A protein has these predicted regions:
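Alpha-mannosidase-like glycoside hydrolase catalytic domains involved in N-glycan trimming
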Residues: 1-37, 44-47, 51-159
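Acidic, contiguous internal or C-terminal segments within carbohydrate-active enzymes
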Residues: 36-43, 155-180
């Protein structure tokens, strides 16, 4: 017998006289409708959460390069137009309106919703995960979407790298949205 995932089965004993009773276990399809969906977009590598088919948010897990945005950013702010990942954008309101912004021309390092430490000291140097200077969050490839009737979630692993080289922090992000 190989070790594997276990399942627990529970039931209430029906009323009746003591003695031997027979039960039949039947496998049926769940009657529960999966309202909340979390899935990876194959084209972009990002993860989308939806509620009854309506968009809730996009988790930008795969690294996004600035692309054409760099040309629009003034020379003083160009150093902040760096490739980034590990953030939410867009986040949608209950009426479908976009609540976040990305790639601002005057602050190109600002991005939707993200967690970042503004000053990271490493081997005598100072980096800034918020301003994308020397420290960058990068996906490890371990990202698990979960869908269900009550909530959808994304459990993602990222690593904070110094100059995209040495690993500083292993981050586990859990993003969960509940059915409206």
């Amino acid at each position: 017998n190989q070790a594997g995932p276990t399942t627990q089965l529970s039931w209430l004993m029906p009323p009746g006289p003591a003695g031997q009773r027979s039960f039949a276990l039947k496998k049926t399809r769940p009657a529960i409708k999966l309202e909340m969906m979390a899935r990876r977009d194959a084209a972009s590598g990002q993860f989308d959460l939806t509620d009854a088919g309506q968009p809730v948010l996009r988790y930008n897990y795969a690294t996004i390069a600035p692309g054409d945005v760099v040309a629009k950013v003034d020379a003083a702010n160009r150093i902040y137009a760096q490739a980034r990942s590990d953030y939410i954008h867009p986040l949608f309101g209950l009426n479908g309106e976009t609540l976040t912004q990305d790639w601002s021309v005057d602050h190109p390092h600002h991005r939707g919703i993200y967690c970042a430490w503004p000053e990271v000291d490493w081997r005598g140097q100072r980096g800034d995960l918020h301003a994308l200077q020397h420290v960058f969050a990068r996906p490890t490839g371990e990202c698990k979407p979960t869908s269900g009737p009550v909530f959808a979630q994304i459990e993602a692993e990222n690593v904070w790298l110094w100059e995209n080289g040495e690993s500083l922090v292993n981050e586990r992000a859990i993003i969960r949205a509940y059915h409206a």
